[in-house]
Amino acid sequence: MLFMKKQKNLLFIVLIFCSSAFAQRQMEYLNRGVVAVPDGGNIFVSWRLLVTDDDKTAFNIYRAVDNSKAVKVNKTPVDAFTHYIDVKADSTKSYTYYVTPVVKGKELAASEKFTLPALAKNYLSIPLRTPEGYSANDASVGDLDGDGEYEVIIHLTGRAKDNSQAGITDPPIFQAYKMNGTFLWQINLGKNIREGAHYTQFMVYDLDGDGKAEIAMKTGDGSIDSKGNVIGDSSKDWRNERGYILSGPEYLSVFNGLTGEVINTTDYISPRHGKLNPTTDELKTMWGDGYGNRMDRFLACVAYLDGVHPSLVMCRGYYTRTILAAWDLKGGKLVKRWVFDSNDEGNKPYAGQGNHNLSVADVDGDGKDEIVYGQMTIDDNGKGLYSTGIGHA
């Protein structure tokens, strides 16, 4: 009995050690993100729970009218939610809110303040500098300047086409704004990046750990950063008579999130073909069609492949051939970590298993992320973990 008890104690210690053995992931610094909006005749206040907060952290909510002294509006610290409905507020007045975390009955440092104007709408509005013929499309957020507050990065689209549709498109445009409406920059991907939902997957994340998010996306000859710097050869036009881009170089670029200036550009992995100008038959053999549909289905994500640092993963294809390329941003350079190609020897079961989306998760509990790619999963080391064989579904 004594021996069994010692075994159980040892097992308990081992389990505790294993559960805490994984290194802390490199995370972005964020403030409380306090925001308030009208909610009927009340004011809805919300804030952010941080990963560094104690599990038993509660919050007090403070409100000030105009320039008066702030008063606490909650009776007891709020510990079950990260929002509060202020039923005693008057939406015709301007209020300033902030919260203070409470741990073991003691108030800690107050959050940043948020001012709600009188008669405000129940949403935040950011005026856009939308070019003629364009409209706002996909958006992402990231802390571009390191102040703990998210900025908004918007993909503006003009004429666009699905991969299955022929036709000339307008160049994809990206703009960044602060939450107060301040315009930061514009990037124009140019005529050699086709516009459409499947073509440009842009990632916004702090890839190098400097506290500021970068922007990464596929670029082409003639892409222009916010400072007017041209990527590749702007004189080239690789579009064919049907509007598809089946030849020419392909690039992967990472941009400074605050300025929109290109940091580094490298060859995109994997290119549509080993040749710069492949024939339609050569493309069909590799991708299943030769006119630019299946080969230009792109996905992307950010994953903690080593369990600590974020890596950029750019993906191509899911109907037939599938390629995932993982990159790290080190010293201002994109460094290839690994490439998974379903055409490689032993990877045939992983072909044609992709979908129109992907997920990132530590599915095997080793503290490192895997890429769940439709009906198959790629391990953190770039090797196939498993494939269900169900196919595109």
Features from the language model and the residues they span:
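Short, Lys/Arg-enriched N-terminal segments with co-localized hydrophobic residues
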Residues: M1-F3
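Sec-dependent signal peptide recognition
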Residues: K6-I13
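Hydrophobic h-region of N-terminal signal peptides that target proteins for export
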Residues: V14-A23
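Amphipathic alpha-helical interaction segments
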Residues: S20, D55-K56
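Beta-propeller-forming repeat regions
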Residues: M27-N31, G40, L49-D54, A64, ...
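Beta-strand-rich domain onsets/edges
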Residues: A36-N42
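Short beta-strand elements bearing conserved aromatic residues within extracellular beta-rich modules
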Residues: A58-I61
